[in-house]
Amino acid sequence: MSDSEDSNFSEEEDSERSSEAEEAEVEEDQRSAAGSEKEEEPEEEEEEEEEYDEEEEEEDDDRPPKKPRHGGFILDEADVDDEYEDEDQWEDGAEDILEKEEIEASNIDNVVLDEDRSGARRLQNLWRDQREEELGEYYMKKYAKSSVGETVYGGSDELSDDITQQQLLPGVKDPNLWTVKCKIGEERATAISLMRKFIAYQFTDTPLQIKSVVAPEHVKGYIYVEAYKQTHVKQAIEGVGNLRLGYWNQQMVPIKEMTDVLKVVKEVANLKPKSWVRLKRGIYKDDIAQVDYVEPSQNTISLKMIPRIDYDRIKARMSLKDWFAKRKKFKRPPQRLFDAEKIRSLGGDVASDGDFLIFEGNRYSRKGFLFKSFAMSAVITEGVKPTLSELEKFEDQPEGIDLEVVTESTGKEREHNFQPGDNVEVCEGELINLQGKVLSVDGNKITIMPKHEDLKDMLEFPAQELRKYFKMGDHVKVIAGRFEGDTGLIVRVEENFVILFSDLTMHELKVLPRDLQLCSETASGVDVGGQHEWGELVQLDPRTVGVIVRLERETFQVLNMHGKVVTVRHQAVTQKKDNRFAVALDSDQNNIHVKDIVKVIDGPHSGREGEIRHLYRSFAFLHCKKLVENGGMFVCKARHLVLAGGSKPRDVTNLTVGGFTPMSPRISSPMHPSAEGQHGGFGSPGGMSRGRGRRDNELIGQTVRISQGPYKGYIGVVKDATESTARVELHSTCQTISVDRQRLTTVDSQRPGGMTSTYGRTPMYGSQTPMYGSGSRTPMYGSQTPLQDGSRTPHYGSQTPLHDGSRTPAQSGAWDPNNPNTPSRAEEEYEYAFDDEPTPSPQAYGGTPNPQTPGYPDPSSPQVNPQYNPQTPGTPAMYNTDQFSPYAAPSPQGSYQPSPSPQSYHQVAPSPAGYQNTHSPASYHPTPSPMAYQASPSPSPVGYSPMTPGAPSPGGYNPHTPGSGIEQNSSDWVTTDIQVKVRDTYLDTQIVGQTGVIRSVTGGMCSVYLKDSEKVVSISSEHLEPITPTKNNKVKVILGEDREATGVLLSIDGEDGIIRMDLEDQQIKILNLRFLGKLLEA
């Protein structure tokens, strides 16, 4: 077919369409004629197509073939090339199916084509017949009243709110939101200040170009500023102090997220009865409460809680103090269950309403709980976990409480803390009580390996169907709650809680099983913030310090210096105290430092040993591994301690005063006996020096005591020595230090240097009697009245100075309790009443250092009760004799009769020169010595003795006053475990007359446990007297050669007692009742 024919075909088709549009309203015969024309067209098209195909085969067509026209919207499939046609392989009937599909497609095309043609004809008629106004009205009705919303929803009234609000959403042409960093807590105030700034600049030349400021409640530290440009934001926030952090950096909020800034989504908690909540405000702020029932319609909730009733206010209101009660500052009353009887006793009116009690408009249960309604906004519902102590307040038995009832937020799963390796137990469902081990955790799905013979495969459970289980002996760690971070060993497992023994504080802790986790490590003892640790010394207030003995999540438990455990918050602990170099003095005047091992000899912790952890003034904090309370920490006074490895109380065989620096010129005088050993230096007898720079081999290996300096009182072994210094290895700290030899004293030596003094011996200088200043003159004291010491006032120190005892300062310094030095300690530093005599020093400086009568050399091994041969005082110059007379002329001391007899066993000579015993072999003291030993100063009367130098006859004893008992001038009778009575001479009248048991003895001081008062006090032995035993009592020998022996008192014969001793032979002995003390019966 030629091009002309093709163009003729297209022209005929166009003219045909136009004629159809023009003849839209002609008669049917004309339409039928047009239809006949349409029937002729397909025939002509078929002929032309055949001709076209023949010509195409003959000629090479350079241009692409023209696509066939189709009147519909469906395009025919592309023809397959002839080379790939395999018609022979088709199944039967396939061609029929294709033909039917082609016929249906052609029918659809014809229908669509008819609709298009009819629409075109109508449009042509409108343009031809109608005027412009009518056309405009036609288009307005067609396009103005129809919209997508009407098409979908059927009308404007039925449109949803979301679609109607679409036009209010921000777009690209609207101002943007910019986030600006702000000071936390000042968001609202900053927004108001920007508003005021905007108003102030509104009518100026440079107004602010921001649109708004948003400060949402839930956003902390940021505000939103609405503006077109970032420069406008910077102009607005310039000069605002709270926004200086965000001046250089503002971030634009994306358009899609701008609506979320103002979106408020409030989740309503799904509260159930018996779930737990906390109050937000008011008098019950932060109190735990249990949900009774919920009223969703009224948005209220009824709670069960522990009431807070101000009983003092009720009492004041019912009295004349009502006006003052109103003016009193408000005080939050403590939590306490409702007590109807107490309210009625105070004058309150309590009514009854069924099962409830009504008081002041509130309802109370019979058990004392308050039931009250609150608004939903007044309670905290999320994340409320009651502690075990709070649960115990709500029920008598915590086992009865459903601990699994927790608050669950809508759409959220309950939190769990399961981890791989935990031992769990199924608590719900068909496999209840099945135990297993957690293998993996995937959200709320827990995979476990069951511990059952028949179940070998892994099982998957929801978290709410599992619970942790533990067995006794497991080592666990607390991962939540009050004791978070603590570790311990499980000692008991109950139904709903576990008891574990803390590794750090050695306390028993009650913890919920869900708050535990198996672990192998031990707690570090450091709090959550890492600022404090267990055992640390902290300051509670300007006058009080303490040691942290328990670390909790929000609080500390601190053992203060007064021995009380207080609970404080972390913020209340102001600062840590560093006392690594603190030094204190123990009861023997030894220096004690941190980390020294000491023993407690007095006070409530008497008998314990421990390591010094902290020293603060006169208090020492010690740690004892055998003590369970407070993790082994306890506090006591430094004067109640004795350094382990330090010097012991000086006995009568020790004349050591080496290394002592005299505080009085009289002591340093060459004639004074205490000064003799100081002139020759250490280890130089008679003051002869060994030479310079040479090693002192004699001193190496000896045990020495340091008498001065920071290590005063320490005992050690000399490793090396020269004529000036010595290297000493200390026993207590195992360290070697260099010490000046002048500060060293051998422990087993009589003097540090020089010879033994003969000062004060009589007869002296050619049998001269009396010796100067000895007090052996006749008449004695010069007609003193009263004669006996006990009745003299003042009793102590009636001479000034009294030899060395009443001098100020004394030899041992202001802290020696043996001397009335000035100044002395303040009374408030003493924990117990000490009457007028504190703990005595091991050595008495108040007497003569050498015996006045008679003279003898220092015995190397003194015996307790050696035999003696009496001699007369006229024996000339007894300088080197071992025999003395117990009936010598009066001297500043007395002596005991060695064997008991019906007569008095005391033979003493009172003298104002000193109150020490004359330590002759007749003394009961186990180690007699030429040194004067002050056992216990006492105001009691001393024994009778002749007042002339002549020796009385053996029978010339002056009998004691009947009922005088044991001579109280000595503490030799004092021993442990015997029952004693407090005498009337004691100052504290509250304990006078009480009986007690001696627990320990230090010098002349006794730690006595009083039965009536149930406390331990420290009392001098002069204020005590032993209780006389009766028949069949267990007794202890307190004097004589059988001292410390025990037995049973079988019978009493006058002043004697018949005793069966507890020794292996159980021999029978007869002893004076004054020699016996009543033992404490178990």
From Swiss-Prot:
DNA binds at R617. GO terms for molecular function: chromatin binding; enzyme binding; protein heterodimerization activity. The modification Phosphothreonine is found at T661, T769, T778, T785, T793, T800, T808, T1028. One of its GO terms (biological process) is transcription elongation-coupled chromatin remodeling. Keywords: Acetylation, Activator, Isopeptide bond, Methylation, Nucleus, Phosphoprotein, Repeat, Repressor, Transcription, Transcription regulation, Ubl conjugation. CDD domains: KOW_Spt5_1 (cd06081), KOW_Spt5_2 (cd06082), KOW_Spt5_3 (cd06083), KOW_Spt5_4 (cd06084), KOW_Spt5_5 (cd06085), KOW_Spt5_6 (cd06086), NGN_Euk (cd09888). Residues 1-88, 669-694, 741-972 are annotated as: Disordered. The modification Phosphoserine is found at S32, S36, S664, S684, S783, S798. Residues 174-268 are annotated as: Interaction with SUPT4H1 and SUPT4H2. Residues 271-304, 418-449, 470-501, 592-625, 698-731 form the KOW domain. The keyword Phosphoprotein applies. It is found in: Nucleus. The modification Omega-N-methylarginine is found at R690, R692. CTR repeats lie at residues 748-753, 754-759, 760-765, 766-772, 775-781, 782-788, 790-796, 797-803, 805-811, 838-845, 848-856, 857-863, 875-879, 890-896, 898-905, 910-915, 918-924, 926-933, 937-944. A motif (UBR5-degron) lies at residues 326-332. InterPro entries: KOW, KOW_Spt5_1, KOW_Spt5_2, KOW_Spt5_3, KOW_Spt5_4, KOW_Spt5_5, KOW_Spt5_6, NGN-domain. Residues 890-905 have a biased composition (Low complexity). There is a cross-link at K141, K1031 (Glycyl lysine isopeptide (Lys-Gly) (interchain with G-Cter in SUMO2)). Signal peptide: none annotated. Its main location: nucleus. Component of the DRB sensitivity-inducing factor complex (DSIF complex), which regulates mRNA processing and transcription elongation by RNA polymerase II. DSIF positively regulates mRNA capping by stimulating the mRNA guanylyltransferase activity of RNGTT/CAP1A. DSIF also acts cooperatively with the negative elongation factor complex (NELF complex) to enhance transcriptional pausing at sites proximal to the promoter. Transcriptional pausing may facilitate the assembly of an elongation competent RNA polymerase II complex. Interacts with SUPT4H1 to form DSIF. DSIF interacts with the positive transcription elongation factor b complex (P-TEFb complex), which is composed of CDK9 and cyclin-T (CCNT1 or CCNT2). DSIF interacts with RNA polymerase II, and this interaction is reduced by phosphorylation of the C-terminal domain (CTD) of POLR2A by P-TEFb. DSIF also interacts with the NELF complex, which is composed of NELFA, NELFB, NELFD and NELFE, and this interaction occurs following prior binding of DSIF to RNA polymerase II. This is Transcription elongation factor SPT5.
